[in-house]
């Protein structure tokens, strides 16, 4: 491939051999200390003849300590020979460059900080700095006891030489230290602060902490074995691995105008009345036509009016009475059709009528409703909707998601939690720490349920319903919503839903919204950038989302467009949560009218006035295509989707793409039809009419399409998948 071969995701490189270094039995001091005694006299800092005595006393000549980062990272560099870097009697990869002395008689092997650890102390601290060389640890950047040692590390492995976490507000459960700057292991570690307090020292991998920027790998030692754990394999799902997350998201605005801010429906909103809806299952309650027929309480009706809701969408007309009747539901409706309000309003109505159990006065919070979604951005969006509809009531909604400080999530919960909106990883962390009880759960909602049940999140969802205290499916109400429900996902859903659940299919089930004008262009891999710039220059400042397949390419294309003087930002799973929120904020406010995104932004995100979606790379599945173009043409507004079709890599999508275009009454290029009819896909019916993606109730046996080969149930392997949680 040429220099534009960006098709493959960058997989973590596996180390062929990771040595395990055991403590050298010869490195112990005379008195049985874990480390040798360090002279405390300041006169011994001289570079005169006494240095030879230092080597003799330290005993490190034959027992170098490879890859150990000691708990205290604040030594004053009183002994330059034992702590100075490389060479005889020095430790390789030692992150214990600290500003305190070993106390005589202490055999613990931990460093004790001295009281004179301050900015104006003239004693040098030569922690390795950033990309190499020595750095004065008494620099203002490392002043005070919270900055331990010099900043740095090798930009390759976690740890290395340098900075421990400057933040001491840790959970007790997380007090594990990564020892072994270059060849790491995990062991408990305490850092004495001089007053009996303990804190944690952790290695970092971000650019400021000297870690490798881009390849988030860490070596974890367990039962004498080393194993690589990467973020793509679930690194974000546990807060005890990797660098400590300190990000606390800013609270949303509390004024009423901001809470009820909404955008106007489009000219096509009235067309929703003509969309066909099919309900399958026994004894389905009749649909409602207005909000008044739902018999909601006055507070809810007031909030609905403030939010600008005047008419029910088709999915709301049928879903609200079904949920009010206490039935389990699987609802499939096109993107941007009001599915969030369809489950929030009846749940809130029940809670207002029956009363709530959780409050800020209870030690253990037991929410009545848990809403789970695959991405942080989507779950935060659901929370804002829940906060809007519950405004002025006793119901309190809380949102928790990965990439933020775990302590912040816990503090939000203990203030009272009736509706918990969460991503799977953070939810299981909170449950594992016993910060919430599940006995009062009445409603379990899976938004983007097809993604929640596939191989990406399916195991975690099964763990959730198997947790101690979680009511069985017969004792709770389970609701699933998505724009696509492949047949395989419906089979998996049987473990979560009662046998008499109802299935609501709205409009062209699993199909693209007809308010989106779809265009497919035949563009070769090496012509895509030029074509993209041409389209964006013609679009001007209209809000545009550009979808690519890999995280690396997202940053590359965003940088390329900025060089072309097109204001662009990017969002993907490798970006820090702070950066992801900043990117969305810049896109929403118009500062950057172009957002380059991977699948993180393809699901559920509701951004106002997105006029264009460009598929720079077509996705691997047709369901993902439907979700991507659904970012435009929402709530009756019109939009445009342009897709680049590469003959070398996208032929497998030709047949389903022709079907999607035909069902949405879009023009199908002749060249695409020719490819579609010349390409054989096992199980594909070839019909351009009828239901699509098997997103009809499989209990009826009506499916006319076997999606083998391109259904969303064949999700990417978790190793290659993006970190959504």
Swiss-Prot record:
It is an enzyme of class 3 (hydrolase). Residues 1-251, 702-725 are annotated as: Disordered. GO terms for biological process: cell differentiation; male meiosis I; male meiotic nuclear division; piRNA processing; spermatogenesis; transposable element silencing by piRNA-mediated DNA methylation; transposable element silencing by piRNA-mediated heterochromatin formation. Gene3D superfamilies: P-loop containing nucleotide triphosphate hydrolases. Keywords: ATP-binding, Cytoplasm, Developmental protein, Differentiation, Helicase, Hydrolase, Meiosis, Nucleotide-binding, Phosphoprotein, Repeat, RNA-mediated gene silencing, Spermatogenesis. Residues 143-156, 196-206 have a biased composition (Low complexity). The modification Phosphoserine is found at residues 223, 227, 723. ATP binds at residues 333-340. Residues 28-43, 703-716 have a biased composition (Polar residues). Residues 320-503 form the Helicase ATP-binding domain. GO terms for cellular component: cytoplasm; perinuclear region of cytoplasm; pi-body; piP-body. Its EC number is 3.6.4.13. It catalyses: ATP + H2O = ADP + phosphate + H(+). Residues 531-676 form the Helicase C-terminal domain. Pfam families: DEAD (PF00270), Helicase_C (PF00271). A motif (DEAD box) lies at residues 447-450. GO terms for molecular function: ATP binding; ATP hydrolysis activity; nucleic acid binding; RNA helicase activity. Residues 229-248 are annotated as: Interaction with RANBP9. It comes from the Eukaryota. A motif (Q motif) lies at residues 289-317. ATP-dependent RNA helicase required during spermatogenesis to repress transposable elements and preventing their mobilization, which is essential for the germline integrity. Acts via the piRNA metabolic process, which mediates the repression of transposable elements during meiosis by forming complexes composed of piRNAs and Piwi proteins and governs the methylation and subsequent repression of transposons. Involved in the secondary piRNAs metabolic process, the production of piRNAs in fetal male germ cells through a ping-pong amplification cycle. Found in a mRNP complex, at least composed of TDRD1, TDRD6, TDRD7 and DDX4. Interacts with RANBP9. Interacts with RANBP10. Interacts with PIWIL2 and MAEL. Interacts with BMAL1 and CLOCK. Interacts with Tex19.1 and, probably, Tex19.2. Interacts with RBM46. Belongs to the DEAD box helicase family. DDX4/VASA subfamily. This is Probable ATP-dependent RNA helicase DDX4. The gene is DDX4.
